[in-house]
Amino acid sequence: MKKLAVAAFGVLVLAGWSSLLLAAEPAVKIASKAGLGSYLVNEVGWTLYWYSKDSPGKSACEGPCLEKRPVFFRRSVTVSAGLVAADFGTLTRRDGTSQTTYRGYPLYYWANDLAGGDTKGQGVNDVWFVIDPAKFPPKPVL
């Protein structure tokens, strides 16, 4: 029983430390890459994408689309310098799950990005893109 209590305490301590470490790190930051420019990433550098078929407050990516494009969600979004926390929000998807938004648009990962800093989802099918905060949302072509 004593070993179980010690083990449980250890788990709680580790959980507490990891929560503190994650809380100290902004949930969304700006990264930069030559040839691509600035773009949004999560706290550990995984690239965030937007889908040009989405509209503010509504996701068009469902079913098989989500297998390649997992949603990004943080209950509370902290941001690094250069970003405004009020630009982030949450939408409720048709399946009842939550998704974080940037300036109203849903945020996603790309399943083929294998490490932080990867941007393999950029330009896929000419509808998936990284998000440059200075140029987002893009102006419609008239």
Located regions from the model:
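Hydrophobic alpha-helical segments of integral membrane proteins
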Residues: 9-20
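Compact beta-sheet-dominated domain cores in extracellular/mature segments
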Residues: 18-142
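Bacterial N-terminal signal peptides that target proteins for export
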Residues: 1-9
